[in-house]
From Swiss-Prot:
Keywords: Amino-acid biosynthesis, Arginine biosynthesis, Cytoplasm, DNA-binding, Repressor, Transcription, Transcription regulation. One of its GO terms (biological process) is protein complex oligomerization. The gene is argR. Pathway: Amino-acid biosynthesis; L-arginine biosynthesis [regulation]. Gene3D superfamilies: 3.30.1360.40, Winged helix-like DNA-binding domain superfamily/Winged helix DNA-binding domain. One of its GO terms (cellular component) is cytoplasm. It comes from the Bacteria. This is Arginine repressor. It is found in: Cytoplasm. It comes from Yersinia enterocolitica serotype O:8 / biotype 1B (strain NCTC 13174 / 8081).
């Protein structure tokens, strides 16, 4: 039978290692975990953990391909409330900028556009994880920002 405390420690160590963004192979992760006292860890277990936690290979600051677990790369599921896909809402003098989980921006932008001018939205432009929304005539950027925050129940 598995020791839940040991499993929890393994998960914490695994996530901490990936935050360092310096491991380019599963073998390197295995060795690092073994050095931290997890003697029974192997490549297949690391592979399953990488998949389970949504790890991706990306370039770090040194332009090396490494495994990482960025929080903003949370994978949306069919049961995710839309508000969980919105990571940040900010604005300047012209537009409201909404940062979302990767792949969610067009879905959120479509929702915003469906609310229309009566709700203060002139239009939205969406990429993969960023939306630019501009207020309709008669609405300020601040009013639009507050309306979007209310819509997604974010704090000011």
């Amino acid at each position: 039978m598995r020791n839940p405390a040991k499993q929890e420690d393994l998960i914490k160590a695994f996530k901490a290692l990936l935050k360092e963004e310096k491991f380019s192979s599963q073998g390197e992760i295995v060795l690092a975990l073994q050095e931290e006292g997890f003697e029974n860890i192997n490549q297949s277990k690391v592979s399953r953990m990488l998949t389970k936690f949504g790890a991706v290979r990306t370039r770090n600051a040194k332009m090396e391909m490494v495994y990482c677990l960025p929080a903003e790369l949370g994978v949306p599921t069919t049961s995710s409330p839309l508000k969980n896909l919105v990571l940040d809402v900010d604005y300047n003098d012209s537009v409201v900028v909404i940062n979302t989980s990767p792949g969610a921006a067009q879905l959120i932008a479509r929702l915003l556009d469906s609310l229309g001018k009566a709700e203060g939205i002139l239009g939205s432009i969406a990429g993969d994880d960023t939306i630019f929304t501009t207020p309709a005539r008669g609405f300020t950027v601040e009013q639009l920002h507050e309306a979007i925050l209310r819509l997604f129940e974010q704090e000011l």
